[in-house]
């Protein structure tokens, strides 16, 4: 009986805690965030960039990391501000203005042999029917897989797409 109790306790402990291996590796990729008109905080986009983007909103992209132990991707470092990105861009009849921010992430995520580009903030004037991917494509050069998964923005990273990597030290939760 004692053996069965010890076995059950060990089994439950194994199933209830994330494995060290799951916390040791994760994925670096482009995270997608949105800020509705007037919002000052990022919201992780629960859909891909194939949604209609509202006039006055800000679209954010961040080269980020996550794994089982760190499920939430980091949003762009700079808070969304439509007025600071698009304040000097005049409204155009029949079009919409969208702020776009591209944060190329922490240097610990940088692929070997590449340089981390500077943050991009750009105001895009787009057709009223433009989707998030259309707006992004007006702001930067987009490289995507056939499935639509975003692999690179403005050539960063140069070749990889959603690569598995060891968890960077700064991301490990203590």
Predicted feature locations:
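Ubiquitin-like/PB1-type beta-grasp interaction modules and other compact soluble beta-rich domains
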Residues: 2, 18-174
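Sec-dependent N-terminal signal peptides
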Residues: 5-14, 20
